Amino acid sequence: GIDIDGNSNDVDITQNLNQSALIDITGASNTLNLNQTHLSNTGEHYADITIVGNSNVMDIDQTETGDKILFLDVDGSNNVTVDQKGTGDHFLDISLTDSHTLDITQDGSGDHNGTLILSGNNTSITLTQDSSSDQNYYLSQNCTNTSCSATVTQN
């Protein structure tokens, strides 16, 4: 189920066929849009999202054929946009603290895995996994500079 403590939270959730989203939001000024859609296709999506803190913006889409699984643990001020779409099985495990901006797309018929563990100062990550072959990416980073960034394209 969905558990929200705090105030000024905007949550929009749309699910279709075999969807499971466990969402826990604590704090204020959080916005979450989750759309797990298969429409007439078969399969399942899974999302486990925990948000603690404030000023968080999430947009998570898991669409169409293939199992998509997402774990997301957020603490602090973060912007996260995730698209897991296409026919392949895709997996993401994201853990964030402090100020981070993520833009992640996993698409194509390949089975893609991504794990991002970020802490420290502001980090901007753009990860694109779009291929018919399987792609894996792992990043564990503690940003000690004023800001850090990475752009990764696997196709």
Predicted regions: what they are:
Residues 1-155:
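Low-complexity repeat regions of mature extracellularly deployed or surface/particle-associated proteins
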